[in-house]
C-alpha cells in the first residue's frame, strides 16, 4: 500500500506527477516541477526562510534532496547571479528539492526567470504540494533517509522499481564527492560581494596571497576573502602541498564540500599535514574543518539528521559569545577524539556537537559552520578578518 504525507493543496491534482520514495518503502506523491527524471540521493531538511538559490547550488548538497520547511519557496524567482557553485553553468549542488506550496510567478526586480524554469535548466527535480514539516518530523525521528525522487509529466511510475532503487542506493558514507565538484584547473579570484545599485565589486588590491583548496567551494566565501585585499588562487582538490608551496602563499584556505570527509581525507591529509609542518596559516570551513580535524588525528561521525539551516546558535567557548550561523553538514568532528594539542573552540547549542577547533601554538583554525552565510546571518563575517590578521602577524614574526 502506498503511504502518503498529505497536505491541503492550492490546486487540484488528479494524477500525481512526482514521487518521493524512501528506502523504508514510504511513497509520497505530489506535483512535479523543474526537471523530469529520476535521482537517488540522501534526503535532508533545511530550515532557512530565504536563499533557496544559494542552497540548491551549494556543491556541499551534491547527491542530496533538500526538503524546505518554509512553505513558500520561489516567490522572488531566480537569476544567474546568486549561484554558489564556482562554475555557474555547471549543475553542481542538490539533485532534488521539495516544497509545500506550488511555485508562483516571481516578484523581484532581480529575477530573470521563475523557479520552475531555473530548476529545469539546472536539472533539479522538484516535488510540490506535500506537508514538508511532517516529512521533517520523519527525518528528525528516523534520521536522514536514502530516497528516490521522480518526476514524470504523465504520472506513470514503476513504484516497485523506485523502491528497489531507494533501498539499494549506497548513501554518502565512504563517498568522496569532491571529484565531482572541484575546479578542473587553478583560477584567480577577484570578485567581491554584491552591493546595492552596484552589483558585484572587484578587488584590485593584493596585500597578501591566499591559496584556496577547492573541495566544493562557495562563491561567497571567495568574495568575502577578497574583501580582505587578498590575491586568491583557487586550486583543485588534488593539488599537492609541493605545488601549493611553489605558489608561495601567505595562507591556505580549506573549503567546504560534499561527501564523507573520511573518504576525501585519503588524499587531503598528506597535503594538509605538510602545510601544517611548514607553519602556514590555515583556515577551514565545513568539510575543510573536518579534514583539518582528521589530519591532526581526530575522527568524524555521520550525524543522525545533520545540521542544515540559517538559524543555528553556536557558542564560542573562549569568549562565551553566542553567534547565529548558517550550517550545512551531515558529518561532524568527534570532539572526544581531538588530541591534546588541539583545542575545541566552538560548540552547537542545539546538540553540543563540535563546531570549531584550533591547533595550539600554530596559526591554524577551522569552523564547522558557514561564516560567509549566503544565505544567513552575518554574525561570523569577522572570521575572514581574523584569518587575514593571523597571516599578517605571522608574516611579521617570520
UniProtKB/Swiss-Prot annotation:
Enzyme class at the top of the EC tree: ligase
Record region (CPSase): 1-207
Protein EC: 6.3.5.5
Reaction(s) catalysed (UniProt annotation): hydrogencarbonate + L-glutamine + 2 ATP + H2O = carbamoyl phosphate + L-glutamate + 2 ADP + phosphate + 2 H(+)
Organism listed in the record: Bartonella tribocorum (strain CIP 105476 / IBS 506)
Binding site for L-glutamine: 60, 257, 259, 287, 290, 328, 330-331
Family listed: Belongs to the CarA family.
Keyword entries, A-Z: Amino-acid biosynthesis, Arginine biosynthesis, ATP-binding, Glutamine amidotransferase, Ligase, Nucleotide-binding, Pyrimidine biosynthesis
Pathway: Amino-acid biosynthesis; L-arginine biosynthesis; carbamoyl phosphate from bicarbonate: step 1/1; Pyrimidine metabolism; UMP biosynthesis via de novo pathway; (S)-dihydroorotate from bicarbonate: step 1/3
Protein name (Swiss-Prot/TrEMBL): Carbamoyl phosphate synthase small chain
One BP term from GO: 'de novo' pyrimidine nucleobase biosynthetic process
Signal peptide as annotated in the record: none
Glutamine amidotransferase type-1 domain boundaries: 209-397
Family annotation (PANTHER family): CARBAMOYL-PHOSPHATE SYNTHASE SMALL CHAIN (PTHR43418:SF7), MULTIFUNCTIONAL TRYPTOPHAN BIOSYNTHESIS PROTEIN-RELATED (PTHR43418)
One GO MF term: glutaminase activity
Active-site residues per Swiss-Prot or TrEMBL entry: 286 (nucleophile), 370, 372
SUPFAM superfamilies: Carbamoyl phosphate synthetase, small subunit N-terminal domain, Class I glutamine amidotransferase-like
Protein function: Small subunit of the glutamine-dependent carbamoyl phosphate synthetase (CPSase). CPSase catalyzes the formation of carbamoyl phosphate from the ammonia moiety of glutamine, carbonate, and phosphate donated by ATP, constituting the first step of 2 biosynthetic pathways, one leading to arginine and/or urea and the other to pyrimidine nucleotides. The small subunit (glutamine amidotransferase) binds and cleaves glutamine to supply the large subunit with the substrate ammonia.
Quaternary structure and partners: Composed of two chains; the small (or glutamine) chain promotes the hydrolysis of glutamine to ammonia, which is used by the large (or ammonia) chain to synthesize carbamoyl phosphate. Tetramer of heterodimers (alpha,beta)4.
Residues annotated as transmembrane: none
InterPro entries the record matches: Anth_synth/Amidotransfase, CarbamoylP_synth_ssu, CarbamoylP_synth_ssu_N, CarbP_synth_ssu_N_sf, Class_I_gatase-like, CPSase_GATase1, GATASE
Amino acid at each position: 500500500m502506498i503511504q502518503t504525507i498529505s497536505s491541503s493543496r492550492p490546486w487540484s491534482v488528479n494524477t500525481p506527477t512526482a514521487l518521493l520514495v524512501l528506502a523504508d518503502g514510504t511513497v509520497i506523491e505530489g506535483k512535479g516541477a523543474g526537471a523530469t527524471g529520476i535521482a537517488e540521493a540522501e534526503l535532508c531538511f533545511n530550515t532557512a526562510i530565504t536563499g533557496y538559490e544559494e542552497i540548491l547550488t551549494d556543491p556541499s548538497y551534491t547527491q542530496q534532496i533538500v526538503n524546505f520547511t518554509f512553505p513558500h519557496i520561489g516567490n522572488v524567482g531566480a537569476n544567474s547571479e546568486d549561484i554558489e557553485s564556482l562554475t555557474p553553468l555547471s549543475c553542481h549542488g542538490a539533485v532534488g528539492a521539495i516544497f509545500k506550496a506550488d511555485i508562483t510567478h516571481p516578484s523581484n526586480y532581480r529575477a530573470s526567470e521563475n523557479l520552475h524554469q531555473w530548476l529545469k535548466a539546472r536539472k533539479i527535480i522538484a516535488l510540490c504540494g506535500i506537508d514538508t514539516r511532517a516529512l521533517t518530523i520523519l527525518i528528525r525521528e528516523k534520521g536522514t533517509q536514502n530516497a528516490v525522487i521522480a518526476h514524470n509529466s504523465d504520472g506513470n511510475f514503476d513504484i516497485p522499481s523506485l523502491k528497489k532503487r531507494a533501498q539499494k542506493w549506497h548513501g554518502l558514507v565512504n563517498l568522496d564527492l569532491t571529484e565531482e565538484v572541484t575546479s578542473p584547473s587553478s583560477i584567480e579570484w577577484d570578485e567581491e560581494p554584491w552591493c546595492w545599485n552596484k552589483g558585484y565589486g572587484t578587488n584590485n588590491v593584493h596585500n597578501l596571497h591566499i591559496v584556496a583548496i577547492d573541495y566544493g567551494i562557495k562563491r561567497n566565501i571567495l568574495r568575502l576573502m577578497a574583501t580582505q585585499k587578498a590575491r586568491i588562487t583557487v586550486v583543485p582538490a588534488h593539488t599537492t602541498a609541493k605545488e601549493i608551496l611553489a605558489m608561495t602563499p601567505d595562507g591556505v584556505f580549506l573549503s567546504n564540500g560534499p561527501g564523507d570527509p573520511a573518504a576525501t581525507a585519503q588524499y587531503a591529509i598528506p597535503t594538509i599535514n605538510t602545510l601544517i609542518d611548514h607553519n602556514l596559516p590555515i583556515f577551514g570551513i565545513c568539510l575543510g574543518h573536518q579534514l583539518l580535524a582528521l589530519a591532526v588525528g581526530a575522527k568524524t561521525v555521520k550525524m543522525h539528521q545533520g545540521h542544515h539551516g540559517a538559524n543555528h546558535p553556536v557558542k564560542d567557548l573562549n569568549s562565551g559569545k553566542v553567534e547565529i550561523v548558517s550550517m550545512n553538514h551531515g558529518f561532524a568532528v568527534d570532539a572526544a577524539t581531538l588530541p591534546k594539542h588541539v583545542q575545541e573552540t566552538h560548540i552547537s547549542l542545539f546538540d553540543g556537537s563540535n563546531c570549531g577547533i584550533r591547533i595550539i601554538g600554530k596559526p591554524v583554525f577551522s569552523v564547522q559552520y558557514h561564516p560567509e552565510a549566503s544565505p544567513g546571518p552575518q554574525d561570523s563575517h569577522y572570521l575572514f578578518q581574523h584569518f587575514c590578521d593571523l597571516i599578517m602577524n605571522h608574516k611579521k614574526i617570520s
